[in-house]
Amino acid sequence: MKLIDIHAVAIIPAKTDSTRLKKKNLRVVAGKTLVEHAIDYAKASKLVQDIIVTSESDEVRDIVETYDNVLFYERDKSYMGEREVADVYVNIFQKQFRDKGEWRIPQMATHVVGIQPDHPDRTNKLDDMIEYFIKNKYDDLVTVDSYGTRNGSVRIVKAEMVKHGTMSRRVG
């Protein structure tokens, strides 16, 4: 696959009902909320064509509405709590796109890039990671910390795996 053929969709899950730290994705770090850091990270990519923020929060919706070309999808309550984030991605592709009549995105998507807002200190450029993913012909890639422990800051998956619900649920 050539880079010109890439249509990456960034999905930023930004729930505010975290059990350990309430509204953590709305916390301000270096003058911006964690949600804003995640959106800006996605917007800096030349390979990401669509950005979707999903949340149950009107506060998150208000932040998203200040950005051009960023979609807000209200997260279904059954996808809250300690649900695997992979289930959120699959739900967006299998249900929410259909319900919103957004057929263009899932039809065009080649890759899904999950960006967790609670990691604002990313040092790798998103495009470099996507290019690495493609060059090495991976199906699924998740970031790790300096000790090699998965941190889920960014996860890249072939869109077909998300569309069909075949992506691993226990990564990232």
Q: Regions from the language model: what does each represent?
A:
Residues 7-12, 35, 50-53:
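Hydrophobic targeting segments
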Residues 107-111, 116-172:
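Conserved core of the sugar-phosphate nucleotidyltransferase
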Residues 24-29, 78-79:
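Short glycine-enriched, charge-decorated loop/helix-capping segments at active-site entrances
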Residues 1-22:
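N-terminal nucleotide-binding beta1-loop-alpha1 segment
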Residues 34-50, 62:
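A short, N-terminal amphipathic alpha-helix
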Residues 6-8, 48, 108-109, 138:
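Local beta-strand N-terminus motif with an aromatic residue
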Residues 52, 58-113, 121-122, 128:
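Short phosphate-binding loop-to-helix
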Residues 51-55, 140-143:
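Short, hydrophobic beta-strand segments that form beta-sheet elements in well-ordered domains
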